[in-house]
UniProtKB/Swiss-Prot annotation:
This is Probable alpha-L-arabinofuranosidase A. Gene3D superfamilies: Glycosidases (3.20.20.80), Golgi alpha-mannosidase II (2.60.40.1180). Keywords: Carbohydrate metabolism, Glycoprotein, Glycosidase, Hydrolase, Polysaccharide degradation, Secreted, Signal. One of its GO terms (molecular function) is alpha-L-arabinofuranosidase activity. GO terms for biological process: arabinan catabolic process; arabinose metabolic process; L-arabinose metabolic process. Glycans are attached at residues 36, 51, 140, 152, 168, 171, 260, 494, 534. Pathway: Glycan metabolism; L-arabinan degradation. GO terms for cellular component: extracellular region. It catalyses: Hydrolysis of terminal non-reducing alpha-L-arabinofuranoside residues in alpha-L-arabinosides. The lineage of its organism: Eukaryota, Fungi, Dikarya, Ascomycota, Pezizomycotina. Disulfide bonds: none annotated. Transmembrane segments: none annotated. It comes from the Eukaryota. It is found in: Secreted.
């Protein structure tokens, strides 16, 4: 991310909107001769934990502050129930990594249920699946523990279980329970754990590291939340860049994302202060990212820390001999990912349940090193990391974190890519339609982050059409632009640090906001060719823009109408007789989808061709995809 956005509304958008629309026409003829090859991994995802996109978002664990991690965790999200009090206890750590537990002090003479609740990440989404709950208990106890999922305002019970359990005051005991649930109508649900007050009056119990999971995406242990994962899977993306982004860098070298603290049992993961204002549990760790890639068929793009923190934080940039420990750390990480089970770190991975090495072909060195004082040292740092990685893993593709020549070696290593980020206004994205037409083809581009940023809390129709125009320009040049990702990807509506985002959600299990930009990304990603074809036209680009591709015997023509007038479109593709037309449109350029309204969704229609000619209307402010066969 380039900078923190605080923009929140659409009121300042300088739109001109006419109730009277003119009708114009564009005729296109698609060549069936073989054209330029198109990147097979052009569309994909950039992910970092921002807007609670990880914890509280796609990561399936539902309880907030569940491990009381960090130096001063407090009791955020927790509340006592009955004749009892709760406190953060540093005298009874669960593990070295989880140095606090939740102490339940029960009053002498207590009666009824005593315990505590957790409100989750502004609610607990109960989707009707069987939930898995684990926690640890320490203290002299023998009896029943009741766990419920209960409406915060209504008291309605959406799931419960009773656990017969004993524990002692010497060691923590792990407890596992399954909770059958019924779907809640909203996210206003609490997790509640209670015991009988009369049986523990005048004593205390300690609890540690609570986990609550619904049935996860692909039933993966410690996996993803289906509510958020499925819309991503529906996009049929090709790659995932992780773990960031700013959230890779940290505020200092000590607060960087440390791969080795995100692996293994979660009780051995300390978490870290993230770079977007909240603590990260790191339950979604290195292996979980690779499982995510595996389960969605995504090519992993692993970002590695490169001696530079945000705004030159801590002692960074780190150069010279001081870089060696960090280079070694990256090599250890790569051995963990790629080494067989006979290697030191490959055997560690195998001990955590993954015997086979992960599939990894691309590594990005750093993040946005052209910013915050990183440029001057990046030539040295990039070269040091690149040389070491290439020597150990010569088949890996290395990606530089910037395309700015002043920050890069005069000659990039053979096969290296550059990463370019572009947050811009709608009009400027359209002006950049031809940005890559004359780029040097010897240096492949990864557009690692882009989107329309224009005082908009939500993606809106004009901005999404502008993104489509930009994407058409990218696809026309997908021999040199190899990958491109909208950013940011995900947003929990209740806790947002950046707007707009591609997909938003609340803790209502039925509420996922698929934005206008989401639909554009989906339309372009699921309709992909491997060859770009020449198109002849009776008019120049603007306000209608287009690109044509094919795969096997199917042709795809993608169009964007960046204007307030209707366009009559004729597309001729020799030998094609039919197809499907998908259109996303709204005559109001300000139209947007949000948590309170869904105004814009794609429409589909079957198409018939006469002598290879398709005729259809492209409305004002619209994006269309013709899939012809």
């Amino acid at each position: 991310m380039v900078a923190l956005s605080t923009l929140s509304g659409l009121s300042a958008l300088p739109f001109l909107f006419s109730l009277v629309q003119n009708v114009y026409g564009v005729s296109l003829e698609v060549s069936t001769e073989k054209g330029n090859s198109s990147s097979p991994i052009l569309y994909g995802f950039m992910f970092e934990d921002i807007n609670h996109s990880g914890d509280g978002g796609i990561y399936g664990q539902l309880l907030r502050n569940n491990g009381l991690q960090g130096s001063k965790p407090g009791l955020t999200a927790w509340a006592a129930v009955g004749d009892a009090t709760i406190a953060v206890d540093a005298q009874n750590p669960l593990t070295e990594a989880i140095p606090h537990s939740l102490k339940l002090d029960v009053k002498q003479g207590a009666s009824g249920a005593v315990g505590f609740t957790n409100e989750g990440y502004w609610g607990v989404p109960v989707d009707g699946s069987e939930f898995l709950n684990t926690f640890w208990i320490k203290g002299n106890f023998s009896g029943d523990i009741t766990v419920r999922l209960v409406g915060n305002n209504t008291g309605t019970e959406y799931g419960s279980t009773k656990i017969s359990q004993s524990s002692n005051s010497s060691n923590f005991t792990k407890v596992l329970a399954k909770i059958p649930t019924k779907k809640a109508p909203d996210g206003a649900v609490l997790y509640e754990l209670t015991v009988d007050g009369a049986s523990v009056g005048g004593s205390s119990l300690n609890f540690g590291l609570f986990e609550l999971f619904p049935q996860t995406y692909k039933s993966r242990s410690n996996g993803l939340k289906p509510q958020v994962a499925q819309p991503l899977a529906d996009m049929k993306g090709s790659f995932l860049r992780f773990p960031g982004g700013n959230n890779l860098e940290g505020a200092s070298e000590a607060r960087r994302w440390k791969w080795n603290e995100t692996i293994g049992p979660v009780e051995n993961r300390p978490g870290r202060q993230g770079d977007w204002s909240y603590y990260n549990t790191d339950g979604l760790g290195l292996d979980e990212y690779f499982y995510w890639c595996e389960d969605m068929g995504l090519t992993p793009v692993l970002g590695v820390w490169a001696g530079f923190a945000l705004e030159s934080g801590g002692n960074t940039p780190i150069t010279g001999d001081a870089l060696k420990p960090y280079i070694d750390d990256v090599l250890n990480e790569l051995e963990y990912v790629l080494g067989d089970a006979s290697t030191k770190y490959g055997s560690l991975r195998a001990s955590y349940g993954r015997k086979e090495p992960w599939k990894l072909t691309m590594v990005e060195i750093g993040n946005e090193d052209m910013l915050g004082g990183g440029c001057e040292s990046y030539v040295e740092r990039f070269t040091a990391f690149s040389d070491a990685i290439h020597a150990a893993y010569p088949d890996l593709t290395i990606i530089a974190s910037t395309d700015q020549s002043s920050c890069l070696p005069s000659k990039l290593p053979e096969g290296a890519w550059v990463d370019y980020h572009n947050y811009n206004t709608a009009d400027n994205l359209v002006k950049q339609f031809s940005q890559f037409d004359n780029k040097d083809r010897s240096v492949p581009y990864f557009i690692g982050e882009y989107s329309c940023q224009q005082d908009n809390a939500w993606p809106f129709m004009q901005g999404s059409v502008a993104e489509a125009v930009y994407m058409i320009g990218i696809e026309r040049n997908s021999d040199v632009v190899k990958m491109a990702a909208y950013a940011p990807l995900l947003q929990l509506v209740n806790s947002t640090q950046w707007t707009p985002n591609l997909i938003a959600f609340t803790q209502n299990p039925s509420t996922v906001i698929e934005t206008t930009s989401y639909y554009v990304q989906q339309m372009f990603s699921v309709n992909r060719g491997d060859t770009i074809h020449n198109v002849t036209s009776d008019s120049a680009f603007g306000p209608v823009y287009w690109v044509a591709s094919s795969a096997d015997d199917k042709y795809y023509v993608k169009l964007a109408n960046y204007g307030a007038d209707t366009q009559e479109i004729t597309v001729t593709i020799s030998g094609k007789t039919g197809g499907k037309l998908t259109v996303l449109a709204d005559s109001d350029p300000k139209a947007f989808n949000s948590d309170t309204q869904t105004l814009v969704t794609p429409s589909e229609s079957d198409m018939k061709a006469t002598n290879g000619k398709f005729t259809f209307t492209l409305p004002a402010w619209s994006v269309g995809v013709l899939a012809a066969h």
